[in-house]
Amino acid sequence: MFGLFKGKKKEPKSPADEAPVDDTAATAPDAVAEQDEQPRLEAGLEKTRSRMGAGLRALFGGRALDDELLEQIEEELLLADTGIDATQSILDTLRREAKRAKTASEVRDILRRTLIDMLVPRESEPPEPPPGQPWVMLVVGVNGSGKTTTIGKLAQRLQAAGHSVALAAGDTFRAAAVEQLQQWGERVGVPVIAQKTGSDSAAVIHDALAHARSRGIEIVLADTAGRLHTQSNLMEELRKVRRVIARFDETAPHETLLVLDGGSGQNALVQARQFGAAVDVTGLAITKLDGTAKGGIAFAIVQETGLPIRFIGVGEKPEDLRPFEPEAFVDALLGQDTGAAVGSGSRG
Ligand SMILES: Nc1nc2c(ncn2[C@@H]2O[C@H](COP(=O)(O)OP(=O)(O)OP(=O)(O)O)[C@@H](O)[C@H]2O)c(=O)[nH]1
Ligand SMILES: [Mg+2]
């Protein structure tokens, strides 16, 4: 479930509470929930899947890998914003393996493995807070990328899983930003620590941390104003927010999550570079993948930044914000295994 929150589970209040909170044991209710999740993920990624997958599915359906098909696959991957480097390594794998493999299903398995490996980050161990201190996530990104919505959805999922959460209304810049977060707080039933628009973002977030510590709240999700790297005053504000959080607890923030709009394509790469340079981003959320055929950006971005994708947004509902799992993501893009033999299908 929330791999990110592993080891952060609340002690079960009673044995009956244990099953929904435990994300390591494969209990029966969890297994049922997972069965429903793959079709949901596939539906959310439908646009990307149709753009990047036709050539690949023809190959897996038994069509021989000739130059024409290779070109089609290359074009589809690039159109889905998979990026030149990631696309080339996918094509290299195909050229190499399609010769050796006896069945289309073998080619598929090898490509599947290659794609999954591409999504595995160069990750270092995330820090943990000292006992009695909240786990802190600072959420950053450009305007409208989905920061506040992602926080709301995460709060809902965490709350449902038995965690205690507080939200920090660190977007003190945009009018109505505080209200938007407060609405989420009310909806989910978690406290929102806020001051009025125009106040100091770092001070609001500091208040939220103090509130969480004094009440034994486990997790603080801190919203920030959307900003571009060119707005140097706002980028400096983010650095200050980080310094203030670190003064509260030197291990914090335990995650600095950069929220990227999946539809922004190659721009997302630029944002990852710029925010990474300014505030030491430790994880990514890619939102709005349901509305775009450019979901190949996930490969490009992990390849380039080495950062882990923590969550993806594939729809408007809270359950459409999903912890990112490379296997499930790749399976949703590639579709079902047909098991056909290489070259046995008609070329039409
Ligand atoms: N379809 C879809 N819409 C999303 C997703 N995530 C966010 N949105 C929508 O994107 C819009 C912007 O989301 P916000 O959460 O307000 O974005 P923000 O980054 O906080 O924006 P600023 O605070 O202005 O910087 C809202 O209409 C959300 O409903 C997603 O995964 N899928
Ligand atoms: Mg916002």
Predicted regions mapped to residue ranges:
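Non-catalytic terminal/linker segments enriched in charged/polar, low-complexity residues
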Residues: M1-M118, R122-E125, G132-Q133, L138, ...
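P-loop/Walker A NTP-binding module and the surrounding RecA-like catalytic core of P-loop NTPases
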Residues: D85, R113-G348
